[in-house]
Structures are given as C-alpha cells and as structure tokens.
C-alpha cells in the first residue's frame, strides 16, 4: 500500500518545498476515497514527520473541501497545518 501511495503522490505532485506541498486538484478528486485518506496522512507525515493531531474527521473535511471544488477556501485542522484549495490546486502549508 505504501508503494501505491508513493506512486500516486509522485503522479499528482505539482510542487514540493520545505513546509509546503502543492497537488493537482483534478487528479486528486479522481482518486479512490481510501487512497485520498492515506495520501493526506502521507503528506502530513512528509511535512511534520508525524500524522499526530490529524484525526479522521479532519481528513474527511479535507476530502469534502477538495470535492466541492470551491476556490479560495481553506481548513486548519490543527494550528500548524493549513490546507487551501485555490486555482485548481491543493496547498498543504506548514504554519509557523
């Protein structure tokens, strides 16, 4: 499963910087629900080194936000992470 998630991540990745990851919204929305949830946790681990603080409800809210495809909306599942949907992209950003 980890290999599938890693390959999917590489496929939909637009840009990766320290503390920030940008994904293609259209490709993300085409994924299966299980892959989306694992991918969100994978990205959180990639940014912070752990997925602690991200609960099932947060992951569901992120998937709903992306599925609604409404621009300029964001979520802050915890005080350190901000997820924004803008310009057909998903931005995962570490907050300082």
Regions found by a protein language model. Give the residues of each.
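AMP-forming adenylation/ATP pyrophosphatase catalytic core
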Residues: 1-96
């Amino acid at each position: 499963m980890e290999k599938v998630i890693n390959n999917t991540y590489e496929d939909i990745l637009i840009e990766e910087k320290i503390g920030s990851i940008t994904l293609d919204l259209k490709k993300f929305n085409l994924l299966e629900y299980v892959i989306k949830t694992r991918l969100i946790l994978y990205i959180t681990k990639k940014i912070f080194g752990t997925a602690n603080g991200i609960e099932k409800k947060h992951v569901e809210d992120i998937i709903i936000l992306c599925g609604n495809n409404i621009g300029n909306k964001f979520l802050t599942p915890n005080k350190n992470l901000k997820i924004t949907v803008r310009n057909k992209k998903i931005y995962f950003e570490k907050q300082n």
